[in-house]
Every structure is written in C-alpha cells, then in structure tokens.
C-alpha cells in the first residue's frame, strides 16, 4: 500500500521546522523583532519589497525613484547585523528548500524528458 502523499508532506513540514537552518532563521527573526531599530528597518524593507512585487504583477513600471529608494534601504540593511544575519539564515534555508524542490520535481522532469528523444 502506498503512503498518503499528504502525510509525507506533513512529515517534510516537520523536518523543515526541526532543521538547524530553520531554527537559526527563527532565532535571527526574534532578534530583529526584539530590537526596535532593526524591526522598523526590516518592516520598511518588507513593505518596499511588497510594493515592488505588486507593481510588477500589475505590469507597472518600476521607476528610478523606486530603485533609488530600494537601494537606500538595502544599504541600511547591510549595516544592520541582526537583519544581515536573518537574511543569511534565510538564504541557507532557501538552498535547502530548493534542493528539496528538485527532489520532489524529479519524477515530472524524468517523465517529460523521456519523451524528448
């Protein structure tokens, strides 16, 4: 009898939550939230990201002013140790999730590549 795919997915969810990189991300996020300056800067960064994504999804042009504002916020973020560590932890976790995604998508990749000969 085959495993319930949703049970496997929930197992993967738990494994990610227990993973060292996720725990480091969680700790880093708590430090950002615990420091008023870091929290304000991080919130500004997230809002800016969302605004730019929304513009892109709506087909609106990203203006020079948008780019300048984004670069200013990024420059400030790179000087903030708490946010810098948070972003590094997020990058490490994204690599893990990317690897997992490749593994999950392998059956589809093999299926489609089998008929390209």
From Swiss-Prot:
This is UPF0342 protein Bcer98_0695. Disulfide bonds: none annotated. InterPro entries: Com_YlbF (IPR010368), YheA/YmcA-like_dom_sf (IPR023378). NCBIfam families: PRK13676.1-4. It comes from the Bacteria. It comes from Bacillus cytotoxicus (strain DSM 22905 / CIP 110041 / 391-98 / NVH 391-98). SUPFAM superfamilies: YheA/YmcA-like. Belongs to the UPF0342 family.
